[in-house]
Amino acid sequence: MAQVQYYGTGRRKSSVARVRLVPGDGRIIVNKHDIREYIPSEALIEMVKQPLVLTETLGSYDVLVNVHGGGFAGQAGAIRHGIARALLEVDPEFRAVLKRAGLLTRDARVKERKKYGLKGARRAPQFSKR
């Protein structure tokens, strides 16, 4: 008999995470590594677990993630977004809780490009009156 799996794709900055939820004991595997080996910050790990905590499904599913692009913060955000989307497949009743916490909305903030004539995206060179 085939095992039940739930899929979700999450994105944040330049990171894309493909998430699979499989009934299990709550392990989170990111790119074939345990999440504690892959993501160095405890705060980011807590952020990743947020959708599972809100829906009270923390120990019920193993989370298998394939993520690429960006840095640790962007990847953690993408994983969180993917888990939230996969949980909707598990039970559509979770939508209200996840939506209220803002976990279903794709965070569209990305780094603004540097413009010529300026030091950064908006920072102008120092102005000298004389």
Swiss-Prot record:
This protein's GO CC annotations = cytosolic small ribosomal subunit
InterPro entries for the chain = Ribosomal_Su5_D2-typ_SF (IPR020568), Ribosomal_uS9 (IPR000754), Ribosomal_uS9_bac/plastid (IPR023035), Ribosomal_uS9_CS (IPR020574), Ribsml_uS5_D2-typ_fold_subgr (IPR014721)
Q: Which GO terms describe its biological process?
A: translation
A molecular function annotated in GO for this UniProt entry is:
structural constituent of ribosome
Q: Which UniProt keywords apply?
A: Ribonucleoprotein, Ribosomal protein
Q: Work out whether the entry's keyword set contains Magnesium.
A: no
A Pfam family hit: Ribosomal_S9
Superkingdom of origin: Bacteria
Gene3D superfamilies recorded: 3.30.230.10
Q: Which HAMAP family match?
A: Ribosomal_uS9_B
Similarity remark: Belongs to the universal ribosomal protein uS9 family.
Q: Which NCBIfam families match?
A: PRK00132.1 (NF001099)
Q: What is this protein called?
A: Small ribosomal subunit protein uS9
At the highest ranks, the source species' classification is: Bacteria, Bacillati, Bacillota, Bacilli, Bacillales
